[in-house]
Regions:
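Active-site-proximal inter-transmembrane loops
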Residues: 134-142, 198-221, 225-228
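Non-catalytic, topology-defining segments of multipass membrane proteins
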Residues: 1-187, 191, 231-292
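Glycine-centered flexibility motif
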Residues: 25, 112, 196, 218-220
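Transmembrane-cytosolic junction motif
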Residues: 190, 194-199
Length: 292
């Protein structure tokens, strides 16, 4: 059952307001090495939390971890202000069930660039969290609390950064970092199904895009990902840079996470010419929603 979160007009006001604050604030504060460090550091933390947390853990369960680190991942990911952890993962599971089909929540093939990039988020019917889709994580009360308090988390992050680093940290480490992380994440939806190469015959138009892979810590190897969603590794070959996977392996080495899923050789090497219709039924059946 989907629980409404906010009116689209309220969300749009906050979204565009953040852009205005980021631009005006950056001009007002100005550039400095401190500003650059705040931007780079906060972006790196956010992007790892989005890609490892929201995507590879909560949406796809490609590795395991403790309940404590699960909460930390969710909290860090929610600093990106991309709505609640359960909302994000539930919608992403829907995307994989219907990728580039009429029911896909953010397909550029079906609705165009602008819809896939950001407009879908403002649609009233997409405002709720479908807890039935994410029952495996919705059973944790602390994650439900985070999910319904996404605005509080966003404000709290801003207050903490302001207290630590002043106006420079607030503007560059919070607002500018958030806006940049937004659009890099959104480009996976809007561009990684349009621009790039196709190694595998997935049932959608997913592409491998090296530039997006660098910016999004490995998420740009999107055709790889749609070919085999169970893997925590999206850069299937050594030359396909996947920063999030490298960090996950380090965390596995120190036992913070475990059972980080790789790519079976026979899956990786099964290169075929693109043919969407031929594999639609197979891909639909392959989307795994873990039992509650």
């Amino acid at each position: 059952m989907a629980v409404p979160k906010s009116r689209p007009s309220t969300l749009a006001l906050a979204f565009w307001g953040a852009h205005i604050v980021a631009v005006v604030g950056a001009i007002w504060i100005g550039w400095s090495w401190a500003a650059l460090w705040w931007l780079a550091g906060s972006y790196a933390v956010r992007m790892f939390a989005i890609t490892a947390g929201y995507h590879r853990y909560f949406a796809h369960r490609t590795f395991k971890t403790s309940r404590v680190f699960q909460f930390i991942l969710a909290l860090l990911a929610m600093s990106s202000v991309q709505q609640g952890v359960l909302w994000w993962a539930a919608h992403h599971r829907d995307h994989h069930r219907n990728s580039d089909q009429p029911d896909d929540v953010h397909s550029p093939v079906q609705r165009g660039f602008w819809w896939a990039h950001v407009a879908w988020i403002f649609a009233a019917r997409e405002k709720g969290t479908d807890f039935d889709r994410i029952r495996d994580f919705a059973k944790y009360p602390e994650l439900r609390w985070l999910d319904r308090n996404d605005r509080l988390i966003a404000v709290a992050w801003g207050v903490v950064l302001l207290a630590i680093g002043g106006a420079t940290a607030l503007v560059w480490g919070h607002f500018v970092s958030i806006v940049v992380a937004w659009h890099v994440t959104f480009c996976i939806n809007s561009l990684a199904h349009v621009l790039g190469s196709r190694r595998y015959a997935t049932s959608d138009d997913s592409r491998n895009n090296p530039a997006l892979a660098l910016l999004a810590f490995g998420e740009g190897w999107h055709n790889n990902h749609h070919h085999y969603q169970r893997s925590a590794r999206q850069g299937f070959y050594w030359w396909e840079i996947d920063i999030t996977y490298y960090v996950l392996k380090l965390l596995e080495a120190v036992r913070i996470v475990r059972d980080v899923e790789g790519v079976p050789r026979h899956v990786r090497d099964r290169v075929t010419a693109p043919n969407r219709s031929r594999v639609r039924a197979v891909a639909t059946a392959a989307v795994v929603v873990p039992p509650s």
